[in-house]
Regions:
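N-terminal nucleotide-binding beta1-loop-alpha1 segment
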Residues: 1-19
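Conserved core of the sugar-phosphate nucleotidyltransferase
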Residues: 112-192
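Short catalytic helix/loop segments, enriched in acidic residues and glycine
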Residues: 20-35
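Conserved beta-loop-beta/alpha segment of the NTase-like Rossmann-fold superfamily
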Residues: 65, 70-141
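Conserved N-terminal catalytic core of the sugar/cofactor nucleotidyltransferase
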Residues: 2-5, 31-100
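N-terminal "arm"/small-domain region of PLP-dependent enzymes with the aminotransferase-like
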Residues: 247-272
Length: 272
């Protein structure tokens, strides 16, 4: 089992926080996202970690090489990170991906340790980690049946508030078997890029595959586990509260500006 981390994006919405560093170099409560993620991955005793770099890639590579000497880490460079999207970053890592069972994840995530452990211990060989829709969630959604089969990927453009009861958010963590990668995912990934270009999302390939074979990819709900995706400054602030101690969480929320309604699972009665 290996891991592939997609870390080529520019993180424009974070403004000055990513002016000279990629998103995974951000600190949440004093710990960089990439340090937290690598610690969690190495705790699983994976054979290697493949990191696709792009924006400020040299800084990220130098930081990792300096702080993780001797660790089985491989770098792949996306030189056109400003003109492509994550589908191309994953395509660049296709040769590594074809060699082993793979955990695929994005570098702007923060999550508790049990999230990855649940993926590895799940008996299903090909799974997408999901979380029941909440109003703070954005991006790709899925619909599942009673047997946890993913029956549809719903891109952001097709999102409907009337359907939110049936939506689950993709956590952007996947576990794929080598067989699935070689026989299904990579051939369709290559065909999709040839047909629609490199400025797309890798989830679109999964959407096509679920249309063809709805039993190929299972959903794994991570109910009750903490996770967050950091796309902007508000996300960063929320992540800092989620992954703080109860005492520190209260202080951070009380010292913030604006209504408490922005924070997940927190009721704000000031408008009542």
């Amino acid at each position: 089992m290996q891991a592939i981390i997609l870390a080529a994006g520019m993180g424009r919405r974070l403004g000055e926080y990513t002016a000279d560093n990629t998103k995974c170099m951000l600190e949440v409560n004093g710990i960089r996202l990439i340090d937290r993620m690598l610690a969690q991955l190495f705790d699983l005793e994976l054979e290697r970690v493949v990191i696709v770099v792009g924006y400020e890639g040299d800084k990220l590579k130098n930081y990792i090489l300096q702080n993780y000497p001797g660790k089985p880490i491989v770098f792949v460079e996306n030189k056109v990170y400003d003109k492509t999207n994550n589908i191309y970053s994953l395509w660049l890592a296709r040769e590594y991906m074809a060699e082993s069972d793979t955990i695929l994840l994005e570098s702007d995530l923060i999550f508790e340790d049990n999230v990855l452990k649940s993926a590895l211990t799940c008996k299903d060989r090909n799974v997408a980690l999901i979380s029941k829709y909440e109003n703070w969630m954005d991006g790709t959604m899925v619909k599942i049946d009673e047997n946890r089969n993913i029956i549809n990927f719903v891109p952001k453009a097709d999102f409907k508030y009337s359907d939110t009861e049936s939506y689950y958010k993709t956590v952007n963590i996947y576990k794929f078997s080598k067989d699935f990668i070689v026989s299904h995912y990579l051939p369709f990934l290559d065909a999709y890029i040839r047909a629609l270009g490199e400025n797309e999302y890798y989830e679109q390939v999964l959407r096509v595959l679920t249309i063809i074979d709805k039993f190929g990819l299972k959903a794994l709900p991570i109910t009750g586990m903490n996770w967050y995706e950091i796309d902007d400054v508000q996300d960063l602030r929320i992540a800092e509260t989620i992954f703080a101690s109860p005492e520190e969480r209260l202080k951070k929320i009380q010292n913030s500006y604006g209504g408490y309604w922005r924070y997940p699972k927190l009721l704000d009665f000031c408008y009542l």
